From Swiss-Prot:
Name of the protein described by the UniProt record: NADH-ubiquinone oxidoreductase chain 1
Gene that this polypeptide is encoded by: mt:ND1
Spans traversing the lipid bilayer: 3-23, 77-97, 104-124, 143-163
Function per UniProt: Core subunit of the mitochondrial membrane respiratory chain NADH dehydrogenase (Complex I) that is believed to belong to the minimal assembly required for catalysis. Complex I functions in the transfer of electrons from NADH to the respiratory chain. The immediate electron acceptor for the enzyme is believed to be ubiquinone.
Family to which the UniProt record says this protein belongs: Belongs to the complex I subunit 1 family.
Amino acid sequence: MEFILSLVGSLLLVICVLVSVAFLTLLERKVLGYIQIRKGPNKVGLMGIPQPFCDAIKLFTKEQTYPLLSNYLSYYISPIFSLFLSLFVWMCMPFFVKLYSFNLGGLFFLCCTSLGVYTVMVAGWSSNSNYALLGGLRAVAQTISYEVSLALIGFKILLFSFL
């Protein structure tokens, strides 16, 4: 019973995160529309509220294209893996229903966010384009250099919070 409750809680968490991101995108498009002195997306439904769902339908019905010389499997798996990594980050956040108990939730957060950049490198490598590969390697180098300082700052905060 505990496993089913945890599974339902995890599924509900994923659905709520994805829907909230869709509506935050709608909010961003509305704000950008008002900045440009236009209304933004307002053609679908009442004030454009169903627009994220229409965008999702349009996204799923689009034709899938890929570069001719690319490594097909890793080219499509890397964005999916990146999505799963970004959803795993939400597991260490405290909620009303305790999904998983992490003693080292901060370390789990740092690990998941640091792995996210490698999906960019795999996507660049699998496209068999030199420019995409260089962009992926540049993203990895930047992330590694910033993660060292981020980890040191985070561990310093954790260290001095117990004193």
